[in-house]
């Protein structure tokens, strides 16, 4: 697909991150049972609604998060129950149409960055619980975020009617989702509430999910959501159910993987708050998804590498502060990475700084996630532990590395500790650097 076509389509998909606040008569009840509110809150957490609908430093669900696209900035809207600035005048029917059909109260179409394609699979009972909680459990916030204003053709919502006819919506589930058996509950969580396929399933020319490649991996605003099918070489077929549960609960498994970027955010705001029963249901379902192979990966990502006894590259000579010459990847690693990850790449003894070998990021068949981690850093709180790694992009407070330096250190790390030299280039880093602003 030509880049310009993909950019335009992604702009269209990115534009509709929320429900619109439109005048109407309020029709929701003045109160709701406590158990219904508790269920609605849990479902909203599982759906990770707060991620897109809360600006940095802003109040929960008040909108205002800006996402840069080639066609302009997308701004998420207020979905608190404020009657004038949020969705306080939505009836339950209005809410259901927005949530499951992507249709606003005025009849216009939402853009599918609001994952109604997945939420269409929600049961009637869960939609009712979500509505009750958003109307009675969320604090109203009297703030109207800036209006999203995109350039042509991304500003044409009417095009979404045609797109919806081609998209594969998740069929609605029936019955009480709380009573589903383990695999059915796991499928419900994966396909509807957690909408795993939104990130991990590749898309076709029209940016509709390719259902025959479900969870086979896909690019995502600079990051790469990896193959999480049951393939033992390209996916996570070697992971146990308990291992995947630990990852979803904490975002980290020693000697295996750690969550950063959008997945780190999903762990922090969503999966780390699920019950053990739901985590096991979700893990059990994902681990039986049919295997899909990836031409870029022929060996389990976590199987690469070993401790490296590298020679000390420090000469003892002082470096002048005005010496702006770029260092090699090995020197950059020694100066910026070795203090935490160790000269041999083994990380810290408590695994706070992870090992760089037996690591699914450095063992991947693509350098994208390593580059984005170097640029973005890691900032994740889950299971009561805050994990932080500084980024090294142009806003870094520790060291601002050039595109060439980041490419050099990424190639050094993957060659020394991971799956080999993937020939990352400064041009590739520059392109991924631009995507940082697009990451919620």
Language model: regions and residue ranges:
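C-terminal segment of classical bacterial N-terminal signal peptides
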Residues: 17-26
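Boundary of Sec targeting at the N-terminus
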Residues: 27-31, 41
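Short, contiguous acidic/charged loop-to-helix segments that flank catalytic cores in large enzymes
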Residues: 235, 347, 356-365, 380, ...
């Amino acid at each position: 697909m030509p880049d310009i076509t993909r950019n335009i389509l992604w702009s269209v998909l990115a534009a509709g991150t929320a429900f619109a606040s439109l005048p109407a008569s309020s029709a929701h009840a003045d109160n709701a049972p406590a158990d219904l509110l508790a269920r609605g809150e849990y479902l909203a957490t599982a759906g990770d609604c707060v991620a897109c609908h809360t600006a940095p430093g802003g109040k929960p669900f008040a909108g205002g998060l800006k996402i840069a696209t080639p066609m302009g900035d997308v701004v998420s809207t207020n979905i608190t129950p404020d009657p004038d600035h949020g969705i306080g005048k939505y009836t339950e029917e209005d809410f259901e149409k927005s949530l499951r059909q992507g249709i606003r109260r005025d009849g216009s179409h939402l853009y599918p960055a609001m994952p109604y394609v997945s939420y269409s699979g929600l049961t009637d009972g869960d939609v009712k619980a979500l509505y009750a909680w958003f109307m009675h459990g969320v604090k109203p916030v009297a703030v109207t975020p800036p209006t999203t204003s995109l350039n042509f053709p991304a500003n044409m919502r009417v095009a979404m009617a045609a797109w919806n006819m081609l998209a594969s919506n998740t069929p609605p589930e029936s019955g009480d989702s709380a009573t589903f058996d383990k695999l059915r509950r796991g499928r419900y969580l994966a396909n509807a509430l957690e909408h795993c396929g939104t990130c991990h399933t590749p898309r076709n020319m029209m940016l509709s999910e390719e259902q025959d490649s479900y969870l086979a991996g896909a690019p995502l605003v600079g990051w790469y959501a990896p193959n999480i099918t049951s393939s033992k070489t390209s996916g996570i077929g070697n992971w146990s159910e308990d291992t995947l549960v630990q990852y979803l609960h904490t975002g980290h498994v020693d000697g295996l993987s750690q969550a950063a970027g959008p997945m780190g955010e999903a762990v922090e705001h969503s999966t780390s708050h699920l019950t053990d029963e739901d985590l096991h249901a979700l893990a059990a379902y994902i681990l039986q998804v049919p295997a899909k192979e990836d031409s870029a990966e022929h060996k389990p990502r976590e199987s690469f590498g070993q401790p490296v006894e590298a020679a000390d590259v420090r000469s003892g000579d002082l470096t002048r502060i005005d010496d702006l010459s770029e260092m090699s990847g090995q020197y950059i690693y020694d100066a910026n990475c070795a203090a935490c990850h160790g000269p041999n790449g083994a990380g810290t003894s408590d695994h706070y700084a992870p090992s760089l070998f037996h690591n699914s990021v450095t063992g991947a068949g693509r350098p994208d996630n390593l580059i984005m981690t170097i640029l973005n850093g890691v900032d994740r709180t889950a299971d009561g532990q805050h994990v932080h790694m500084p980024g090294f992009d142009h806003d870094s407070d520790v060291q601002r590395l050039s595109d060439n330096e980041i490419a050099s250190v990424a190639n050094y790390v993957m060659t020394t500790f991971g799956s080999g030299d993937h020939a990352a280039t400064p041009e590739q880093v520059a392109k991924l650097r631009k995507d940082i602003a697009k990451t919620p």
